[in-house]
């Protein structure tokens, strides 16, 4: 399957673009933005040593600086030439990819919406308006936002509220309901709400189907959604809401053995890659990656990650697998 070829420590949140790694290096109370090779070599480092939030895409690097007065100065560099495109004093929140719709940054707080062009370094629109919830993602027409039990759909061009829906209406009496994730599928929204899943029309929010089955996360592959709930795995036909399992009680994944020890398959997310489901597990103080056959839910590969921390994320780039843990370490694997 894969073998580990590099470990980069203390990198925190990273961004991968064109075979390069971008992130923060903390050193003696200073924070630099760096561009690294896959071998961990520093190819470029910011002159600024007080970098706070940051983001990068194929064209630009953008970060802001933390000063005693606050977080204001924003710098935008051409990612390839490292020439400064923009430098200005403006308060922007940069840290989450959820804030970006291609090259447009949306800063939405309680009473204001500001849109900013990160390629040119200019404010496109600033409007005094209050939007409910937090941003999940953008579609071509909509801003999708949510809070604990509500989903809010705003029209992107004027920030008007198109519709909102209390998900509790579909699960009356379920006190543990909470929106965990929202996905866009065709012309619908799939909402993972802990105690169940609902599919709503993007146009007006009417209910298309509902599944009364616990759900934490979903990985969408074609018209199928692979759902995890902590120890179990099942899949759903997203066109009609029909649920399928693997013939096991409560859809529970089987325990697994490693070096003569038995472990619970305690995880909450699968990632689809090359026809298989990659499942991160933290059990008895150990972190593992289990590779699951989606047809049978049988294990195809069991790998122990060399860390005492919890594995947080698995991503695939070209022939590489990137794994991060709660200790801000990045493990790089190559396909064998």
Which positions does each model-derived feature cover?
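A short beta-strand motif characteristic of beta-propeller blades
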Residues: 2-8, 40-46, 83-89, 122-128, ...
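N-terminal "mature head" segments of proteins
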Residues: 1-90, 117, 125-127, 327-330
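Structural motif
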Residues: 28-34, 69-76, 111-115, 148-153, ...
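Solenoidal tandem-repeat scaffolds enriched in leucines and small polar residues
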Residues: 106-208
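Short loop/turn segments that connect beta-strands within beta-propeller blades
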Residues: 37-39, 78-82, 117-121, 155-159, ...
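Blade-level signature of beta-propeller repeat domains, shared across WD40, Kelch, NHL, RCC1
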Residues: 306-336
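Short beta-strand elements that form the blades of beta-propeller/WD-repeat-like
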Residues: 15-27, 59-68, 101-108, 140-147, ...
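Repeated scaffold domains used in trafficking and secretory/extracellular systems
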Residues: 7-19, 47-60, 89-102, 128-141, ...
């Amino acid at each position: 399957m894969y073998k580990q070829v590099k470990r980069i420590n203390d990198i925190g949140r990273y961004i991968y673009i064109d075979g390069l790694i971008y992130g923060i290096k903390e050193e003696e109370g200073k924070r630099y933005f760096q561009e690294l090779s896959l071998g961990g070599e520093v190819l470029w480092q910011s002159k600024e040593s007080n970098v706070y939030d940051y983001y990068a895409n194929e064209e630009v690097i953008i970060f802001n600086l933390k000063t005693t007065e606050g977080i204001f100065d924003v710098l935008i560099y051409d990612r390839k030439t490292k020439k400064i495109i923009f430098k200005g004093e403006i308060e922007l929140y940069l840290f989450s990819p959820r804030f970006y719709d291609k090259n447009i940054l949306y800063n939405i707080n309680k009473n204001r919406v500001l849109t900013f062009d990160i390629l040119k370094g200019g404010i496109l629109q600033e409007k005094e308006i209050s939007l409910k919830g937090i941003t999940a993602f953008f579609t071509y027409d909509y801003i999708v936002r949510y809070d604990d039990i509500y989903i809010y759909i705003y029209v992107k061009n004027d920030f008007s509220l198109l519709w909102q829906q209390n998900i509790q209406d579909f699960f009356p009496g379920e006190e543990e309901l909470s929106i965990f994730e929202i996905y866009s599928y065709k012309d619908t929204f799939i909402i993972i709400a802990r105690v169940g899943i609902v599919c709503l029309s993007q146009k007006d929010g009417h209910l298309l189907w509902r599944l009364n089955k616990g759900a934490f996360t979903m990985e969408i592959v074609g018209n199928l959604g692979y759902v995890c709930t902590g120890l179990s795995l099942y899949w759903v036909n997203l066109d009609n809401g029909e649920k399928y399992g693997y013939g096991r009680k409560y859809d529970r994944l089987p325990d697994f053995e490693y070096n003569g020890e038995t472990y619970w398959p305690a995880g909450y997310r699968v990632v689809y890659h090359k026809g298989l489901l990659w499942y991160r597990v933290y059990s008895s103080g150990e972190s593992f990656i289990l590779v699951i056959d989606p047809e049978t839910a049988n294990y195809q590969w069991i790998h122990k990650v060399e860390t005492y921390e919890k594995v947080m994320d698995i991503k695939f780039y070209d022939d590489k697998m990137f794994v991060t843990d709660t200790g801000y370490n990045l493990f790089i694997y190559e396909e064998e």
